[in-house]
Amino acid sequence: MSIEKPEVDFPGGEPPADLAIKDIWEGDGPVAQAGQTVSVHYVGVAFSTGEEFDASWNRGTPLQFQLGAGQVISGWDQGVQGMKVGGRRELIIPAHLAYGDRGAGGGKIAPGETLIFVCDLVAV
């Protein structure tokens, strides 16, 4: 199955206070668990503006990281766990589980910004 870069649906309204996880579709491969190295394709969008700030798809290479080891923002460490390879999941990550009051990306992510990611688990 060939997957393509997803469009991110902008929910509007008030951002959630806690991590919101929604499976867009569930994969049928191995389950991602803490301590494993995972490979994730993603699109990231700012909740307040709907503007895309980053996407691994644009680089053609998924992001590899050790799950649960603090190599990525907390919302990812929590939100990717339990995904199955081949699955796509939407994560809405409040600032305290993302970049907090410091923002990131050279101004692309504002301080206190809630983030929306659509993540595809490519491999574990």
Curated annotation (Swiss-Prot):
PPIase FKBP-type domain mapped to chain residues: 35-124
EC id: 5.2.1.8
Activity regulation info: Inhibited by FK506, ascomycin and rapamycin.
InterPro entries given in the database record: PPIase_dom_sf (IPR046357), PPIase_FKBP_dom (IPR001179)
Alphabetized GO MF terms: peptidyl-prolyl cis-trans isomerase activity
Pfam families noted in UniProt: FKBP_C
Nucleotidyltransferase in keyword set: no
Transmembrane segments: none
Substrates-to-products reaction catalysed: [protein]-peptidylproline (omega=180) = [protein]-peptidylproline (omega=0)
Keywords for the protein's UniProt record, in alphabetical order: Isomerase, Rotamase
Family annotation (PANTHER family): 39 KDA FK506-BINDING NUCLEAR PROTEIN, FKBP-TYPE PEPTIDYL-PROLYL CIS-TRANS ISOMERASE FKPA
Annotated family: Belongs to the FKBP-type PPIase family.
Described function: PPIases accelerate the folding of proteins.
Name this protein carries in UniProt: FK506-binding protein
Species of origin: Streptomyces anulatus (Streptomyces chrysomallus)
